[in-house]
């Protein structure tokens, strides 16, 4: 079940939805930011990497690194020597961030160009990292479809970012149907922005209607029913799922 290339399409259509409510569950601390040219990012962006492999299919490695950096910065039971000099209070320098990406790609999350990696490979790499660094966590790929939102909420309540996959089209893998992402405008409108498929993202917030996401170094939102629709009509619930992480 390879995750292949993201498909993102700018949309001119404008729609209005309610802004996120006070009931949104979110991470308790600032999310990882990288100092690219321009404004600081919301998570890493594989498209800005220097290497062709990471640029084209590195979304899973970016999601894994952002999660590990977040744990190292904000969880007292996590100490990762390789990330000791990274500071969560300010944007991370792009060269240091890309060096960490390359380390993870070579040692834990191999990418098969141009297909990337799938959820099972992501879970195996994460568990290997946890074991080598004696971290008190374990990871597994996919949860039952009926428990998806409950598990995402539970992880966010424990201040754990949630790596999600918008899976590839399946079984018609050659199709280019995507799930719609939105941005929140200064006026409080959710406006359609991009469409994605075969792409790892990170959930940083959740309410009854919306998921807050980090993808391509930016903050996006996706409707919960849109994710469910895409999984049912264009992919399946194994490919469209999460990396569930528990404390041992």
Task: State what each model feature region is.
Residues 105-200, 204-206, 244-247:
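Predominantly the structural core of cysteine protease catalytic domains
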Residues 66, 168-171, 218-220:
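Solvent-exposed loop/turn segments at secondary-structure junctions
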Residues 18, 22-35, 41-48, 135-145, ...:
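Generic preference for hydrophobic/aromatic residues in regular secondary structure cores
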Residues 98-102, 106, 150, 154, ...:
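Polar/charged alpha-helical tracts
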Residues 68, 72, 131, 239-241:
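Generic short alpha-helical segment signal, independent of protein family or function
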Residues 25, 48, 181-248:
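Noncatalytic regulatory segments and standalone regulatory/sensor domains
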Residues 3-121, 194:
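Active-site-adjacent structural segments surrounding the nucleophilic cysteine of cysteine proteases
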């Amino acid at each position: 079940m390879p995750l292949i290339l993201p498909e993102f399409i700018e949309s001119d259509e404008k729609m209005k939805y309610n802004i996120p409510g006070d009931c949104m569950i979110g991470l308790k601390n600032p999310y990882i930011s990288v100092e690219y040219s321009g404004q600081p990012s919301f998570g890493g962006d594989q498209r800005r990497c220097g290497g062709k492999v990471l640029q084209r299919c590195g979304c899973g490695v970016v999601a894994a690194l952002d999660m590990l950096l977040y744990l190292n910065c904000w969880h007292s039971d996590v100490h990762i020597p390789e990330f000791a000099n990274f500071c969560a209070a300010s944007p991370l320098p792009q060269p240091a961030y890309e060096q960490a990406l390359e380390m993870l790609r070579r040692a834990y999350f191999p990418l098969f160009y141009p297909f990337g990696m799938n959820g099972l490979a992501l879970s195996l790499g994460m568990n290997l990292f946890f074991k080598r660094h004696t971290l008190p966590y374990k990871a597994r790929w996919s949860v039952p479809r009926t428990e998806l939102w409950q598990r995402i909420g539970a992880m966010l309540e424990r201040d754990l970012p949630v790596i999600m996959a918008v899976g590839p089209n399946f079984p018609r893998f050659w199709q280019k149907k995507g799930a719609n992402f939105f941005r929140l405008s200064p006026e409080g409108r959710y406006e359609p922005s991009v469409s994605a498929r075969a792409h790892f993202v990170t959930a940083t917030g959740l309410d009854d209607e919306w998921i807050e996401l980090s993808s391509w170094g930016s903050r996006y939102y996706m409707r919960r029913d849109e994710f469910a629709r895409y999984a049912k009509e264009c992919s399946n619930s194994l490919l469209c799922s999460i990396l569930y992480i528990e404390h041992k």
